[in-house]
Amino acid sequence: MTHDSAAAPRGRQEPSLEPAPAGRPIAIYYEHPRWFERLFTELENRGTPYRRVHADSHTFDPSELAADDSVALVFNRMSPSAYRREHGHDIFYTLSYLGHLEAQGKRVINGERAFRYEISKALQLSLLRSLGLPFPRSRVIHRAADAVAASAGLRFPVVVKPNIGGSGAGVTRFDSREQLAAAAEQGLIDLGLDHVALVQEFIPARGGYITRVEVVGGRFIYSIRVYLSGETFDLCPADICRTTAGVELNLACPVEAPKAALRVESYTPPAEVIAAVERQAAAAGIEVGGVEYIIDDRDGQLYYYDLNALSNFVADAPRVLGFDPFVRLCEFLEAEAGNVR
């Protein structure tokens, strides 16, 4: 689907950065059918020209080596959880498309490098190691039969995480080596789309929450604590349904995945954590995204464990945060589009 929004007067009182020039829309490349409606609405309200580019029906001609001047830039919003919606092929196609765009000099936000980290939890841990940042002890496997041997030296419980994840897809906890062995023998270990997975020590969360830190333009914009319920690994902030005070979030419950047990609150991490998150984003080429970390309840150790180039803003953000991050995102996109010549 393609949509070029009409140029219209801005509906906001406060001053904003310069929008993209008329006739040079911002291309939003995406797959999920609903996650970006709030972004589209904000762009339309601001009169910012944009184009919807749906990954599933997209094609490109690799012989076209000159930069496409019909759009100012491309904002990659491809989701690694696409394979849960029968769009797994879109993921690998996107790698080729982003590489093609960047080879021809097109400005891409969250380009090929960012997306490679997005779709590889193994690469994320290697990045954390290169930055000297702590992460849970892990092993990388590509055969389920190797899971038990790979767990040697790890403290149980462990989790097996598919390399290509998204919204906690396929993450399974095993409380003992025997339980892991039985699952491997019965073919119950999910290695995910690329048949690569982590065997990773399970970290019990101090305070019962994890923390997600968001960046726009590679800089800290906000952070939230997400309070866990049971052993859920699906922590998409756009799907969380209530604040820590129990207030329902009206925009939070998609039809297919209500998570009414999850609670969220705004939180500002220590300066050293914010700096570490910004270092991760810069090293991974993630300009808009998020980083998740957890505090081990056993010893108070902080561990970073997930980088997200596609990180959805928390539902009903003005109520939770006190401001609308989509406004900040659109200002960033407009400024970047205005810098393209």
Task: Give the residues covered by each predicted segment.
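Short, surface-exposed charged micro-motifs
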Residues: 212, 292-294
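Short glycine-rich anion-binding loops that position phosphate/pyrophosphate groups of nucleotides
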Residues: 79-83, 164-165, 310
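Active-site nucleotide/adenylate-binding loops and adjacent lid/helix of ATP-dependent enzymes
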Residues: 2, 8-22, 27, 98-99, ...
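C-terminal active-site "lid" helix and adjoining low-complexity regulatory extension at the edge
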Residues: 264-268, 272, 282-286, 295-341
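Protein kinase-like catalytic core scaffold
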Residues: 158, 221-222, 289, 301-305
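Conserved N-proximal alpha/beta basic substrate-recognition cap immediately N-terminal to
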Residues: 31-137
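Phosphate-binding site of ATP-dependent enzymes
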Residues: 172-281
